[in-house]
C-alpha cells in the first residue's frame, strides 16, 4: 500500500464534474477520482474545516465510531474496475465498505492516512 495526500479538488475541464487529485506521499504518481458534487463538498469541507458549529455527517460518523470505543485507522482505496474506485475505512482493524469520497473525507477529519493498493496505482496512476 502507498500513502496518498490530497493535491486538489477541481472541476474537470471537459465534463464539468468534480475530480479529486491525490498524489503519492513518497513518489510522483497521481490518482484522479471523479465524484459527485456532494462528495467533493464533503472533502472540501474537511480540508477547510468548514462550519465547525454544525458537525458534518463525516464528523458524526467519527463520533459514533468513537462512542462505541472504536477508531478509524486508515482509508484504503483497494480496487478499481471500469472507472469505479472501491474503498473502505479500517475501523479497529476491520474493513468497512465506503464510497471513496466518504472514506477520504472521514480520513481527513480523523487525521488518519489515505492509502491505495499498489496495483490500483500501477493501473491508473499517472505521473
Where are these regions (language model features)?
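Divalent-cation
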Residues: 1-127
Amino acid at each position: 500500500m502507498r500513502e496518498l495526500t490530497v493535491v486538489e479538488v477541481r472541476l474537470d475541464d471537459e465534463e464539468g464534474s468534480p475530480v479529486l487529485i491525490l498524489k503519492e506521499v513518497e513518489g510522483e504518481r497521481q490518482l484522479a477520482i471523479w465524484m459527485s458534487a456532494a462528495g467533493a463538498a464533503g472533502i472540501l469541507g474537511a480540508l477547510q474545516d468548514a462550519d465547525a458549529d454544525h458537525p458534518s455527517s463525516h464528523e458524526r460518523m467519527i463520533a459514533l465510531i468513537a462512542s462505541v470505543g472504536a477508531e478509524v485507522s486508515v482509508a484504503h482505496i483497494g480496487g478499481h474496475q471500469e472507472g469505479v474506485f472501491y474503498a473502505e475505512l479500517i475501523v479497529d482493524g476491520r474493513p468497512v465498505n465506503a464510497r471513496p469520497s466518504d472514506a477520504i473525507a472521514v480520513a481527513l477529519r480523523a487525521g488518519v492516512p489515505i492509502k491505495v493498493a499498489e496495483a490500483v496505482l500501477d493501473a491508473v496512476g499517472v505521473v
